Amino acid sequence: MHILLTNDDGYFAPGLQTLYTTLAEAGYDVFIVAPDSQKSATGHSITLFEPLFITKHSLDRGTGYAVSGKPADCVKLAIQGSIIPKPDLVISGINNGPNLGTDVFYSGTVSAAMEGVLLGVPAIAVSLASFSAVDYKPAAQFVALSLPKLRLGPGLININIPPLPEKEWKGVRVTKLGKAVYENVFEHRQAPYGRDYYWQAGTVSPEVDQETDLYAVQEGYVSITPMHSDLTDYIKLKELRQSLSLENPNK
């Protein structure tokens, strides 16, 4: 299996490098195409009207590419630019920090994986729900061991690992996306010369819906959430056709 590995933390991020080593040792053909610098929270943005520069880096089993663009750029370039063999799977991560609930819309990690889906390649996004993690090996091993069981299809699987030692994980839950609600989102500050500014911060409110990814990780479980790119509200679609007296063009 050819695996394209990318992220939004940058080419040299320990989560990505640990995942590369783990998957390569498991016998997979792994290729890295990742941003050349930190690109967190860039969502699904792509680079227009600017060139994309790539820098080659030697890997134990081939060549990796650091790209001057966004995470989605990396996946587009890898697949549509044919700088690596066509992948059978895109894996984005391991991210430094969680990608849970509605935060996936801001996530460069999840968006890179979704770009693979849009280009016809199954994808996985992997995040470790800690901003101070130093050991990504348990998360990487979980991914490697889970690959044969995930029944990869045309969509995306979003995996979040709890911020706990592996022996303290309570298990695995298959979940739906929660709604990340933040408290105290903006801090009002003053710059040295007196100019006011705002610093985006905030903490996520505790989740109470036990079916969600937020709740699972909050309680110490690994969360696995299947996702797809179709954002259509089919209930509203039907209601609007009826209320506007429009016939279904597909009938």
Curated annotation (Swiss-Prot):
Enzyme class, broadest EC rank: hydrolase
Gene3D superfamilies reported in the protein's UniProt record: Survival protein SurE-like phosphatase/nucleotidase (3.40.1210.10)
Residues annotated to bind a divalent metal cation: 8-9, 40, 95
Documented EC number(s): 3.1.3.5
Coiled coil: none
Gene Ontology molecular-function annotations: 3'-nucleotidase activity; 5'-nucleotidase activity; exopolyphosphatase activity; metal ion binding; nucleotide binding
Role: Nucleotidase that shows phosphatase activity on nucleoside 5'-monophosphates.
NCBIfam families xrefs: PRK00346.1-4, PRK00346.2-2, surE
Similarity comment text for this entry: Belongs to the SurE nucleotidase family.
Name recorded for this polypeptide: 5'-nucleotidase SurE
Originating organism: Desulfitobacterium hafniense (strain Y51)
Taxonomic lineage from the root: Bacteria, Bacillati, Bacillota, Clostridia, Eubacteriales
Gene: surE
